[in-house]
């Protein structure tokens, strides 16, 4: 582990309460020293965004800087949506759900047209999203990257208008494996970026 928690340790001996408090303090130090007005967080309902929401909630109580949360579903399963709503309402000073499925479809349609995958000149409304996703040459990774970037456009616009920053939810395991999207799910400041996935669960 590097960065905020620059100490040697055995995972079985890790004091997660101490780790949590250090992450809260370091995040609070960053947002206050940069005179930021809000923290913006995309909440998926997964463990990473939930832990970051909990950290930022404590930062908000400590600094008075509000946490703005958004659940931005694109073809999400109902159970993921339910969890994201619970997390957002529990930890955020302001929380909304905004469905980005139409934005995703619009971008996907334009990209398919640009690359020549759509050649019959049928209009946007003629296609289902699944039709576009399954055109020859498209892959689940490419489609997933578009979804992540659609969400970041939304979050960064909020941060820009309200003079804040977007919180990153990536952990060290994802970073080392390359399991993240450039200009997608990586934000401005990552409270859990030095934690391995197992440690995120421990936290």
Residue ranges of predicted features:
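ATP-dependent adenylation/nucleotidyltransferase module used to activate substrates
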Residues: 2-181, 185
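Gly/Ser/Thr-rich active-site loops/lids in small-molecule metabolic enzymes
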Residues: 184-202
């Amino acid at each position: 582990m590097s960065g905020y928690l620059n100490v040697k340790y055995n995972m079985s001996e890790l004091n997660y309460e101490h780790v949590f408090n250090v992450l809260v303090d370091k995040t609070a130090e960053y947002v206050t020293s940069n005179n930021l007005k809000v923290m913006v967080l995309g909440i998926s309902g997964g463990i990473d965004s939930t832990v970051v929401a909990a950290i930022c909630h404590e930062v908000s109580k400590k600094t008075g800087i509000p946490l703005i949360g958004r659940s931005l579903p694109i073809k999400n399963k109902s159970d993921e949506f339910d969890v994201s709503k619970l997390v957002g309402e529990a930890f955020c000073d302001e929380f909304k759900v905004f469905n980005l499925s139409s934005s995703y479809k619009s971008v996907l349609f334009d990209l398919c047209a640009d690359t020549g995958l759509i050649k019959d000149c049928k209009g946007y409304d003629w296609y289902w999203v699944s039709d576009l996703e399954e055109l020859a040459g498209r892959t689940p990774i490419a489609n997933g990257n578009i979804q992540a970037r659609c969400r970041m456009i939304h979050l960064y616009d909020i941060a820009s208008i309200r003079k804040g920053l977007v919180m990153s939810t990536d952990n060290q395991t994802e970073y080392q494996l390359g399991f993240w999207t450039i200009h997608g799910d990586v934000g401005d400041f990552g409270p859990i970026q030095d934690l391995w996935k197992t440690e995120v669960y421990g936290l």
